[in-house]
A protein has these predicted regions:
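Extracytoplasmic
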Residues: 5-39, 60, 223-228
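Helix-breaking motifs and short loop linkers at transmembrane-helix boundaries and internal kinks
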Residues: 36, 68, 89-95, 122, ...
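Conserved MFS/SLC helix-loop-helix module at the cytosolic interface between two early adjacent transmembrane helices
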Residues: 55-93
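Paired small-residue
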Residues: 79, 83-86, 94-102, 298-306
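Helix-loop-helix hairpin linking two adjacent transmembrane segments in secondary transporters
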Residues: 95, 131-177
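Cytoplasmic helix-loop-helix junction between adjacent transmembrane helices
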Residues: 99-136
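Juxtamembrane intracellular "pre-TM" segments in multi-pass secondary transporters
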Residues: 180-210
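C-terminal transmembrane helical hairpin of 12-TM major facilitator-type secondary transporters
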Residues: 271-310
Length: 310
């Protein structure tokens, strides 16, 4: 029988990369001022981080198949700790961006949590547990901007990375004590999984949902990169209030997941994707109409909730 880590442990690890992504978003204007750079450059703390997350997603799974889930999880979260401490201590923009990229190693938490669930659960249990992980991933970006905004207002932008450093030490502790090895069929060929990728690349069953998901998820990226600038320069909002408004897309994501989990058995996937795409399209149109008619932050931020709900 496989040793079972607590589900709360897997949920925290799975949500950590997106929390790390968005917790600094309300502080971007202040980080821009501290490093004396332009907003386009400081945005790389989000876009560069996401590129590194994609790389971690690519390599973490095969590495854990070869060397074990627990070992790779510990290594990647140790790198995450180094990145968080490095960001806090950085005096120059280039050093800061380097350590920010290292923080993307936290994405291993999502990849390996899913793999661990596959190791320890039956097919039916796996679906249920992955649904709970999705909720955790929705909660993290809901709370993170607000937490980041409060820390920025009361202690300063770089103190966010001190907070993440403390969290990373806690995560290493719970990985060490709660996460036992679950992969007892470790492969000798580290490239075994990667060799199957060409099969996926020629499959329309892979590309259609992947493109749909990628375009949908890009809403988060665009919103979290441009949202703080609009909040600060257009609406003159404080980081704490900005964090509150930036929670809107995550709330839509949670509500959408809850609804889909309840109607997935009675509504076809194709129909769900159609209505979801319709909501995605209607969001920006509503935002444009509202912003032309009224000058208020809600006119810009609330329609994003509609988009992420879809």
């Amino acid at each position: 029988m496989h040793p079972r880590p607590h589900l709360i442990t897997l949920s925290i690890l799975a949500g950590m990369y997106i929390l790390t992504q968005v917790i600094i978003v309300p502080a971007l204007p202040d980080l821009q001022s501290q490093f004396k750079t332009d907003y386009k450059t400081i945005q790389f703390t989000i876009s560069g981080y996401l590129l590194a997350v994609a790389l971690v997603n690519f390599i973490a799974g095969p590495l854990s198949d070869r060397y074990g889930r627990r070992t790779i999880m510990l290594i990647f979260f140790f790198i995450f700790m180094l990145g968080s401490v490095g960001c806090f201590l950085s005096e120059t923009l280039s050093t800061f961006l380097f350590f920010r990229i290292l923080q993307a190693s936290s994405a291993a938490g999502l990849v390996l949590s899913r793999a661990i669930i596959g190791d320890i659960s039956s097919e039916k249990e796996t679906v249920k547990m992955l649904g709970l992980l999705s909720i955790a991933m929705g909660i993290a970006p809901s709370l993170a901007p607000l937490v980041g905004g409060i820390i920025n207002d009361f202690f300063g932008a770089k103190q966010i990375f001190l907070f993440l450093s403390i969290v990373s030490i806690f995560l290493l502790f719970i990985i060490f004590y709660d996460l036992k090895e679950t992969n007892f069929k470790q492969t000798e060929d580290i490239f075994a999984q990667i060799k199957s990728y060409p099969i996926l690349l020629i499959s329309m069953n892979f590309w259609l949902p992947t493109i749909t998901f990628s375009l949908s998820f890009s809403i988060f990226g665009v919103f979290f990169i441009g949202g703080p600038f609009i909040a600060s320069k257009v609406f003159n909002l404080t980081p704490t209030v900005t964090g509150f408004y930036l929670a809107c897309p995550s709330l839509g994501y949670i509500l959408g997941n809850v609804l889909v989990s309840r109607i997935a058995n009675i509504v076809s996937t194709k129909r769900l994707m159609f209505w979801g795409s319709l909501l995605l399209t209607s969001g920006p149109i509503c935002s444009l109409i509202f912003c032309i008619s009224f000058f208020h932050p809600l006119c810009f931020y609330l329609p994003v909730l509609l988009m992420t709900f879809g």
